[in-house]
Amino acid sequence: MCSTCANVLKYYNWDPHFKLVINPNKFLSIGFCDNPLMCCYPELLPEFGTVWDCDQSPLQIYLESILGDDEWSSTYEAIDPVVPPMHWNEAGKIFQPHPGVLMHHIIGEVAKAWDPNLPLFRLEADDGSITAPEQGTVVGGVIAEPSSQMSTAADMASGKSVDSEWEAFFSFHTSVNWSTSETQGKILFKQSLGPLLNPYLEHLSKLYVAWSGSVEVRFSISGSGVFGGKLAAIVVPPGVDPIQSTSMLQYPHVLFDARQVEPVIFTIPDLRSTLYHLMSDTDTTSLVIMVYNDLINPYANDSNSSGCIVTVETKPGSDFKFHLLKPPGSMLTHGSVPSDLIPKTSSLWIGNRFWSDITDFVIRPFVFQANRHFDFNQETAGWSTPRFRPITVTISEKNGAKLGVGVATDFIVPGIPDGWPDTTIGEKLVPAGDYAITNGSGNDITTANQYDAADIIRNNTNFKGMYICGSLQRAWGDKKISNTAFITTATVEGNDLIPSNVIDQTKIAIFQDNHVQDEVQTSDDTLALLGYTGIGEEAIGANRERVVRISTLPETGARGGNHPIFYKNSIKLGYVIRSIDVFNSQILHTSRQLSLNHYLLPPDSFAVYRIIDSNGSWFDVGIDFDGFSFVGVSDVGKLEFPLTASYMGIQLAKIRLASNIRSTMTKL
């Protein structure tokens, strides 16, 4: 007999040395019946395991167990049962429980018999699927404790939420950089009490109108070579705006050290005058983490800063409750969480100025854009919807003219075509002729090598700085094929184009051969934006004076040590087989979401997303109330695409955004 068959026989009492016995009725806590799985609830039996008859041979049971396994059906490889069949003496059967069911039962029996005077134990699986996190050191005393009376009153007034296992463990919320360059009084972390602090609370908050109770926050510090430094955890009451000053230490606070090995736990108490908060209530108790003593690392030097990573985890306090259930599809008037402004993968990122893929982030002192840029009020200072589709206009010309003014037929701002590009030409032009591209010596550029080797590119084209459009031009009686169109925002004076960075219905300039004769011909033009004639120019959107606006140009600068960014993509150039960079103020998906949805974001805060490249480098991008994006580093470096984005929560704008990218240091 083979060894496998011998081992199988041992499962079923053919080996006299041992016998495995089980009673699956104990899996059910039923008090009125002593045999529920065979009497009252036989339909539940398959949920707990498989029943075999005792008259079947051991080998037959073994083979049937293998043949019923999913692994056999897909690979035809025999996998021994994880849990052996056992004797169910009360039913005269052999029962093989599901592994998870048996494990749950065993853990429950261990827990019942555990002596509360013994130390706690930690349970883990090899693959990390089962964990019981270490709790850390609880810090209290000066911080208010949860009020059980208020919690009970809130339950009586509105109903109690369902208890679940997610209430028992800490979940990741965010991480914060603490570097040796941060001085005393610098705020590293500020978060108001509310469901947004915890991913499970945020998820469940969609089902309720109100909440109440405290949240526990756990901080873990990790750093290399750290010698000293302290942080202060400060509880700031509702109605007080934290400031970056040591005067904040006049509020209740506790200190913890950078060399702290164990995690530190704080409770953010719910200081309220009502039974509960509506989801729109952001004026709640805040927890602020401030630098108390500067971080010291003796291994750091002038060209190399050092720091720690402070990991922030949260879980609901014992008194946290949700109140006033609402249907899942109902929308609250105050707005929703801005958790879907950036798609999870960069393969879905295109610009809001041009429709090609985003390839980089460009940090600038100032970022500005009006067209297709939306804020958290669902408003834009531009004239286009957050989508790309062909521009539709009509144009009337006579006497063989090729330059004219288009009349919008599809628009959201009267007279300005939806999708019209938002930069003007750099100088006065008389559109005519062909491309004229030369190098610094005045020699014509006709090859890629000549273009790449040229130290200076001179663009003498008479329609430079205009956008190239594929055209469907139609007019009654005109049977000729359509010609390429060149468009821009400018004042048309005879055959001249005068630059204008303010757009209105008189500045829709189109240069195109529409086969016009002496009589007036009105053409219906459908224009698809394809390229640009600004060979040798700086990136599109980089020059404030050439960016078009109706009246106001939305603009932003640095905030709290965070730098504004453009999202960079490119557009193809005319004549030369090359491209030019385009600066976009938003990802188009962000523009679309802000235009369609009302999101909840305080004016002094960021909606934070973590961007991770394929090599594991990451940095946080914060989107402010005006719709502009920021990063906390001065240079994001070379990123390995594709990138992924994940929502991290709401952060105060005055706090530097986190990253694991080391900024370039310069020594004078």
From Swiss-Prot:
Gene3D superfamilies: 2.60.120.20. One of its GO terms (cellular component) is host cell cytoplasm. Pfam families: Calici_coat. CDD domains: rhv_like (cd00205). SUPFAM superfamilies: Positive stranded ssRNA viruses (SSF88633). Keywords: Capsid protein, Disulfide bond, Host cytoplasm, T=3 icosahedral capsid protein, Virion. Changing A125 to G/H/L/R/V: No effect on precursor cleavage by calcivirin. It comes from the Viruses. The record marks N459, N462 as: Interaction with host receptor F11R/JAM-1. The record marks E124, A125 as: Cleavage. InterPro entries: Calicivirus_coat, Rhv-like, Viral_coat. Mostly expressed from a sgRNA. Expression from the g-RNA is low and occurs at a downstream start codon generating a smaller, truncated LC-VP1 (tLC-VP1) protein. Belongs to the caliciviridae capsid protein family. This is Capsid protein VP1. It comes from Feline calicivirus (strain Cat/United States/Urbana/1960) (FCV).
